[in-house]
Each structure stands twice: as C-alpha cells, then as structure tokens.
C-alpha cells in the first residue's frame, strides 16, 4: 500500500466536513414543526361549508389549536391531538369538523364568521408553529335579484289588472254612449213626428 500524500488528505477532510454539516443541518431541520398553508385567503358566501386547509410535519404527536379573531378579540374554536376527540368550544359545537392533518371544516358559515383564523401546531413546549388564514364571507347577491324580480312581477300583475279595468270601463262607456245616442235618435224621431202631426 502506498502512503497518502498531503494533498489527498486535505481533499478527504473537506468532503468529511461537508457531509458532517449536511447531516447536522438535516438533524436540526427535522427537529420542530413545519406548517404549510396552501391558501391564506378564502372568499365564501353565506351558508357554504368551508375547508380551512393546513398540513404539518413533525416527529411526535402535536397539539393543534385553532383560534378565531373577529373585530372584538380572540376566540378559541377547537383544540385536539390527532387520533383523540377534539375539544370544541361551545360557540362552534356542531359547526366544525377536525382532520388529522390539522385542517378544519366550518359548516354553514355566516357573515359574522369573517375574520382571521390562527392555527398553532405544538409538538412540545417551545416547539410550535403558527399560521393565519383570512376568511371573507359575503351575502348572496341572488337574493337581491330575486327581490327585484318579484317586485317587477308584482308591478306587471298590477299593470295587467289596471289595463283590464280600463278596457272594461271603456266598453261600458261605449255601450252607455250607444244607448244614449239610440235614445236621442228615438226622441228626435218622435219630436219630428209630433211636429209633423201638429202641422
């Protein structure tokens, strides 16, 4: 076996250091929690069911907590560990469904559900990750159009009734004038006959 030269040793040392640093970086990166939110803003209409979707990566079993921040403060929605029953707040009971990946589904949303939703995934104290989703809920515009359509249909019905009444009144007036002319014609004929008789 031939002896190692000095240059060959130094080439091996940087490769070893590089491998050490890559391994250390992966170990440090694998500790803790990673949180992914695919959609940070969601637009919805009243009475829809909305999925607030997230995904996390961690080595242990985390605790997942969702909070809601309306204009007046912070309100806890739900807290759970995957595989265990969720602790749902009274305000959202029967309106929320949890998933093991950390996502929640809100049923039958209303305008008052608009606001920021904060998810916190905690693996152990000191190792947590938070994210925010903005939910905007708006009224259904079709209700306004429905009201306008009903209003115009009602106006059209009233117009048809008024036109029908005007036609009936016109027919009555025409018949009345016809009778009057006939009577006037008869009376004129009688007067002429009487004048002829007197002469």
Swiss-Prot record:
Region (Important for CDC42-dependent filopodia induction) residue spans: 169-185
Free-text disruption phenotype from the record: RNAi-mediated knockdown mice have significantly lower density of dendritic filopodia and dendritic spines in embryonic hippocampal neurons. Lower density of excitatory synapses and significantly decreased dendritic spine to shaft ratio of F-actin in the later stages of neuron development. Aberrant neuronal migration in the cerebral cortex of developing mouse embryo. Neurons settle in the marginal zone (MZ) closer to the pial side and the corresponding percentage of neurons is decreased in the dense cortical plate (dCP), reflecting the overmigration of those neurons.
Signal peptide range: 1-27
Keyword Acyltransferase: no
Location (main, coarse): membrane
Extracellular topological domain residue ranges: 28-146
InterPro entries cross-referenced by the UniProt entry: CD2/SLAM_rcpt (IPR015631), Ig-like_dom_sf (IPR036179), Ig-like_fold (IPR013783), Ig_sub (IPR003599), Ig_V-set (IPR013106)
SMART domains to which the protein is assigned, alphabetical: IG
Tissue specificity remark: Highly expressed in the central nervous system (CNS), with the highest expression in thalamus, hippocampus, cerebrum, midbrain and spinal cord. Also highly expressed in stomach, kidney and small intestine.
Record's bilayer topology term: Single-pass type I membrane protein
Protein's cellular compartments: Cell membrane; Cell projection, Dendrite; Cell projection, Axon
Residues annotated as glycosylated: 43, 87, 101
Superkingdom per UniProt: Eukaryota
GO BP annotations listed: filopodium assembly; positive regulation of excitatory synapse assembly; protein homooligomerization; ventral spinal cord development
Topological domains annotated Cytoplasmic: 168-199
Membrane-traversing stretches: 147-167
Domain Ig-like C2-type, residue spans: 35-138
A GO CC term assigned to this protein in UniProt: membrane
Post-translational modification summary for this protein: N-glycosylated.
Keywords: Cell membrane, Cell projection, Developmental protein, Glycoprotein, Membrane, Signal, Transmembrane, Transmembrane helix
Biological role stated in the UniProt entry: Cell adhesion-like membrane protein of the central nervous system (CNS) which modulates both the position and complexity of central neurons by altering their membrane morphology and dynamics. Involved in the formation of neuronal dendrites and protrusions including dendritic filopodia. In synaptogenesis, regulates synapse formation by altering dendritic spine morphology and actin distribution. Promotes formation of unstable neuronal spines such as thin and branched types. Regulates neuronal morphogenesis and migration during cortical development in the brain.
Quaternary structure, from the entry: Can homooligomerize through cis interactions within the same cell membrane.
Protein name in the entry: V-set and transmembrane domain-containing protein 5
The species this protein was found in: Mus musculus (Mouse)
Gene (UniProt): Vstm5
């Amino acid at each position: 076996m031939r002896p190692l030269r000095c240059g060959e040793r130094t080439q091996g040392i940087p490769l070893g250091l590089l491998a050490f640093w890559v391994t250390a970086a992966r170990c440090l990166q694998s500790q803790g929690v990673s949180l992914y939110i695919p959609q940070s803003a969601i637009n919805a209409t009243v009475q829809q069911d909305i999925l607030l979707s997230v995904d996390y990566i961690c080595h242990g079993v985390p605790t997942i907590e969702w909070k809601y921040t309306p204009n007046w403060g912070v309100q806890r929605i739900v807290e759970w560990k995957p595989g265990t029953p969720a602790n749902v707040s009274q305000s959202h009971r029967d309106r929320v469904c949890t998933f093991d990946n950390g996502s929640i589904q809100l049923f039958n949303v209303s305008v008052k559900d608009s606001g920021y939703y904060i998810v916190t995934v905690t693996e152990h104290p000191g190792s947590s990750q938070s994210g925010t989703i903005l939910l905007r809920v708006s009224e259904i515009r079709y209700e306004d159009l429905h009201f306008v359509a009903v209003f115009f249909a009602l106006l059209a019905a009233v117009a048809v009734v008024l036109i029908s009444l005007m036609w009936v009144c016109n027919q009555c007036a025409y018949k009345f004038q016809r009778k009057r002319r006939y009577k006037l014609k008869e009376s004129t004929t009688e007067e002429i006959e009487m004048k002829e008789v007197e002469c």
